[in-house]
């Protein structure tokens, strides 16, 4: 057939998903920072002697008070979310190293669990941050006094733990976003 041009079409075949260095580094980062956040909050404790005025006619009574992480359920939740995310990060890192992108089903499960970790960590961070704001500012409407002026070290350590945990949240968020961007670029 003369005059008919033959154009070859390149057929793109899906390759198995290779585990990228960025994926491994983000999982390692998520593991490290969620572990650090959990440890920092788990050792957060401060004792102070606080003067309590019982009556105007009596001198203040000095009472030792201790602030501990397990006294507030939001902080307990924060610790548990970081422990779960830390455990998941190390397990997914090991699976990524062993599997090396061979099983599509496993990577689908990991992608779903990565998104779950984002939600879990951000909810834990939000709960802890809400308690932290109450600690720093109090709430005059319900007569909750601020406590961070008394337990400064405790509050600073809690704030540092929340900040470190946010890095873990962002690492998991990137683990969700990057594959989506790569998939979009292929199409």
Curated annotation (Swiss-Prot):
UniProt keyword terms in alphabetical order: Cell membrane, Membrane, Transmembrane, Transmembrane helix
Spell out the subcellular localization from the entry. Answer: Cell membrane
Q: How does it sit in the membrane?
A: Multi-pass membrane protein
A GO-annotated cellular component: plasma membrane
Q: Does the keyword Cell membrane apply?
A: yes
Where it mainly occurs, coarsely classed, is membrane
Where, in residue ranges, is this chain on the Cytoplasmic side? Answer: 1-22, 99-114, 179-187
Transmembrane annotation, as ranges: 23-43, 78-98, 115-135, 158-178
Task: Enumerate the Extracellular topological stretches.
Answer: 44-77, 136-157
For this protein, the record's InterPro entries field holds: CASP/CASPL, CASP_dom, CASPL
Q: Does the keyword Transmembrane apply?
A: yes
Q: How does it assemble?
A: Homodimer and heterodimers.
Please give the family membership noted in the entry. Belongs to the Casparian strip membrane proteins (CASP) family.
Q: Read off the PANTHER family from this record.
A: CASP-LIKE PROTEIN 1U1 (PTHR36488:SF8)
Q: Note the NCBIfam families from the entry.
A: A_tha_TIGR01569 (TIGR01569)
Q: Tell me the protein's name.
A: CASP-like protein 1E2
Give the species this sequence originates from: Glycine max (Soybean)
Taxonomically, what lineage is the organism? Answer: Eukaryota, Viridiplantae, Streptophyta, Embryophyta, Tracheophyta
